[in-house]
């Protein structure tokens, strides 16, 4: 039994999200939640919410035992880039890229 939760278009770069995802891949969900709760990275809070959603999906939809669940797969894919401009000297402007990503978490026995 495998249950997924997906978050699309969150304002986090995929590279920074993968740093957090690599820390919890393959761990039991209780240990993964503990690691994410005490991580200072911005992506930790976002991935924690997605993991909690996947756990709730497994419990509600499949009737799974939470203590037996592991993080089967977790990956962070690159989303679209929001392009913004900031004013510079002499009437010029510079582009600012605001990257987004898609986070997918799958939990199972």
UniProtKB/Swiss-Prot annotation:
UniProt entry tagged with the keyword rRNA-binding: yes
Source species, domain of life: Bacteria
Pfam family, one: Ribosomal_L22
GO cellular component, one term: cytosolic large ribosomal subunit
Keyword Oxidoreductase attributed: no
Any one biological process term the GO annotation gives: translation
Role of this protein: This protein binds specifically to 23S rRNA; its binding is stimulated by other ribosomal proteins, e.g. L4, L17, and L20. It is important during the early stages of 50S assembly. It makes multiple contacts with different domains of the 23S rRNA in the assembled 50S subunit and ribosome. The globular domain of the protein is located near the polypeptide exit tunnel on the outside of the subunit, while an extended beta-hairpin is found that lines the wall of the exit tunnel in the center of the 70S ribosome.
Family: Belongs to the universal ribosomal protein uL22 family.
Protein name, entry field: Large ribosomal subunit protein uL22
Species in which this protein is naturally found: Thiobacillus denitrificans (strain ATCC 25259 / T1)
